[in-house]
Amino acid sequence: MSLNPRDAVIVDFGRTPMGRSKGGMHRNTRAETMSAHLISKVLERNAKIDPAEVEDVIWGCVNQTLEQGWNIARMASLMTQIPHTSAGQTVSRLCGSSMSALHTAVQAIQTGNGDVFVVGGVEHMGHVGMMHGVDPNPHLSLYAAKASGMMGLTAEMLGKMHGISREAQDAFGERSHRLAHKATVEGKFKDEIIPMQGYDENGFLKVFDYDETIRPETTLESLATLKPAFNPKGGTVTAGTSSQITDGASCMIVMSAQRAQDLGIQPMAVVRAMAVAGVDPAIMGYGPVPSTQKALKRAGLTMADIDFVELNEAFAAQALPVLKDLKLLDKMEEKVNLHGGAIALGHPFGCSGARISGTLLNVMKQNGGTLGVSTMCVGLGQGITTVFERV
């Protein structure tokens, strides 16, 4: 395929192993240290790229305080081989932060405002809890449902509206762990996981090159025993069908097609379209439907044209209505989250957008796909989507 000089292409992707937030592998590693290690290793394996060419490090992070404060993009960049002459900015679109980081870089490239960008994101949810320092305006309840800030209750609402049964949610949760374990055993994650030192459950330092969050022993029977996590009386959403609270980072190198060609670099994919959309915060998990419809329209495509999809699994009760309305339920086994998702791998907020996008590109490469969509819901009622074409 032919590319325009100002097309934005992805030339590499890497991520940390996903660690449990409670006593997990990253418990003694700071968020900016994790980010810097990842950025450094991804740049090291792309020797044709001079770090001095990096225009901007654009890093997603939601709770920007404590070790994640004071512009963690710049903090991490200063700890890498990227020179001080390159810039850094931290962005937040809650769950969609690192996908927004990608979109920001793509827009800069398309408009001639840079040729080489490092994008991604991090969230150390073990060190900086999701609600640490958060003080929502009490007047917000005059404009949106009071429970809109309680993600589990929005999932309960969406699941109830779409008639999603507890059994269907449990089956989706079991699938996530089963497929993630299968991908691990078959080495499907080896190109994306950047090994990192961490501590095992006994406190011994070791190198991790796998996700410690996956539970291969998960069964429908074990999931059926779990109690509702958010609505004790009549709820259907459990811890086993919710994204895990984890620690991790993800990183992409994004370039103009012209600069990649000049350096003799074969891109993984080109970004064909992007979109964001808003929905009622009470059903925040529905956001991927309008954002994906908008992105596909901009690309001149329909969902039937798409080979593979990565949908962030915030909750099974949220993912299943999205798949239903995107006409993907009957195609799920052949198209959607073939290596599992956030129920098994976790959802470190600032990390996930680039993580699912990079995993998508590897799924496309491993299975011969040409067109792919990565999409996710965003807290308080948004969706964000990227359409990729493999080159």
From Swiss-Prot:
The record's subcellular locations are: Cytoplasm
Metabolic or biological pathway, per its Swiss-Prot or TrEMBL entry: Lipid metabolism; fatty acid beta-oxidation
Against PROSITE patterns, the record matches this protein to: THIOLASE_1, THIOLASE_2
User: Which EC number applies?
Assistant: 2.3.1.16
Q: What catalytic reaction does the record list?
A: an acyl-CoA + acetyl-CoA = a 3-oxoacyl-CoA + CoA
A GO term, aspect molecular function: acetyl-CoA C-acyltransferase activity
UniProt KW keywords: Acyltransferase, Cytoplasm, Fatty acid metabolism, Lipid degradation, Lipid metabolism, Transferase
Pfam family for this entry, one? Thiolase_N
Instruction: State the active site.
Output: C95, H347, C377
Q: Which family does it belong to?
A: Belongs to the thiolase-like superfamily. Thiolase family.
Record's NCBIfam families?
AcCoA-C-Actrans, fadA, PRK08947.1
What is the protein's name according to its record?
A: 3-ketoacyl-CoA thiolase
From the broadest rank down, the organism's phylogenetic lineage runs: Bacteria, Pseudomonadati, Pseudomonadota, Gammaproteobacteria, Pseudomonadales
Q: What is the name of the gene encoding this protein?
A: fadA
